[in-house]
Amino acid sequence: MDPNTVSSFQDILMRMSKMQLGSSSEDLNGMITQFESLKLYRDSLGETVMRMGDLHSLQNRNGKWREQLGQKFEEIRWLIEEVRHKLKITENSFEQITFMQALQLLFEVEQEIRTFSFQLI
């Protein structure tokens, strides 16, 4: 697991949790929850790849891991759209920077998950 990605996740989550977006705070909390879920999934997939012999364990534990992988990519695409939308409507520079960094992080994580999944297939 890339230490920069871990610190980026932690930084983005901390900054998002400090934001007050008025009536959209539920949306922001949902995004934070999705980010946390995505981080956990990415970490577990990365650990599985590092153990390499663990593919059978992954398949036994979750026979539908490819379906789950597809769902995670859908979540990433949803998060990307949500972050882009928030970026368009916010005028606060702190929030704009946070959402731009969140968007970059999502693209990086999507690429990492693709790389991990190709190694497992």
Swiss-Prot record:
Motif Nuclear export signal per UniProt: ranges: 12-21, 85-94
Transport recorded as keyword: yes
Cellular localization per UniProt: Virion; Host nucleus
Domain of life: Viruses
GO biological process: exit of virus from host cell nucleus through nuclear pore
One cellular component (GO) term of this entry: virion component
Keywords, alphabetical: Host nucleus, Host-virus interaction, Transport, Virion
Cross-referenced Gene3D superfamilies: 1.10.287.230, S15/NS1, RNA-binding
Pfam families linked to this entry: Flu_NS2
Main location per the UniProt record: virion
Quaternary structure and interacting proteins, as annotated: Interacts with protein M1. May interact with host nucleoporin RAB/HRB and exportin XPO1/CRM1.
Family to which this protein belongs: Belongs to the influenza viruses NEP family.
Role according to the record: Mediates the nuclear export of encapsidated genomic RNAs (ribonucleoproteins, RNPs). Acts as an adapter between viral RNPs complexes and the nuclear export machinery of the cell. Possesses no intrinsic RNA-binding activity, but includes a C-terminal M1-binding domain. This domain is believed to allow recognition of RNPs bound to the protein M1.
HAMAP family found in the cross-reference section: INFV_NEP
Name of the featured protein: Nuclear export protein
Organism for this UniProt entry: Influenza A virus (strain A/Singapore/1/1957 H2N2)
Lineage: Viruses, Riboviria, Orthornavirae, Negarnaviricota, Polyploviricotina
